[in-house]
């Protein structure tokens, strides 16, 4: 995230983030990941000189259910459209590109959203956006997990 940012003379910065990774025992409940982060660069008087946010979330089902996947993306689009109607298209593409595995010629999982170096909103609104990304992730993921957590499975599915 720092590669396109110019260096400040004092080199002070702060990076804060929260990551959540879920690897459930039941293979009918997908693995998922969520991350939100804020970076700040400071001038010699310790004032914020520059800042940006990043984050996202993605879903990697062991046993894909098309209705879960469609709803996952539908909820992400609905949420992001309330901020900016270009966000879903851009952030979904970023997720697909970020989680592409070249030697397999495939993506990891079924997608989600990913963004970095974002600074479209004020810092206050950006922090609110990050909070809402985390809440949206929890709502979307828990909806799937709650629906699938009691689905029976054989021990052979654990060793996929």
Model-inferred region functions:
Residues 1-53:
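Internal mixed beta-strand/loop scaffold within catalytic domains of large alpha/beta enzymes
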Residues 159-160:
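Conserved small/polar residues in nucleotide/adenosyl-binding loops
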């Amino acid at each position: 995230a720092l590669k396109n940012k110019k260096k400040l003379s004092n080199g002070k910065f702060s990076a804060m983030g929260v990551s959540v990774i879920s690897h459930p025992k039941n293979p009918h409940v997908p693995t998922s990941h969520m991350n939100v982060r804020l970076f700040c660069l400071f001038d010699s008087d310790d004032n914020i000189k520059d800042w940006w946010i990043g984050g996202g979330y993605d879903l990697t089902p062991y046993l894909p259910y098309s209705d879960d996947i469609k709803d996952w993306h539908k909820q992400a689009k609905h949420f992001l459209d309330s901020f900016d109607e270009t966000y879903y298209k851009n952030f979904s593409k970023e997720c697909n590109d970020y989680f592409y595995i070249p030697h397999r010629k495939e993506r990891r999982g079924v997608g989600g959203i990913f963004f970095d170096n974002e600074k479209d909103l004020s810092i206050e609104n950006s922090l609110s956006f990050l909070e809402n990304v985390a809440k949206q992730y929890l709502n979307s993921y828990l909806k799937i997990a709650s629906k699938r957590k009691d689905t029976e499975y054989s021990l052979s599915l654990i060793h996929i």
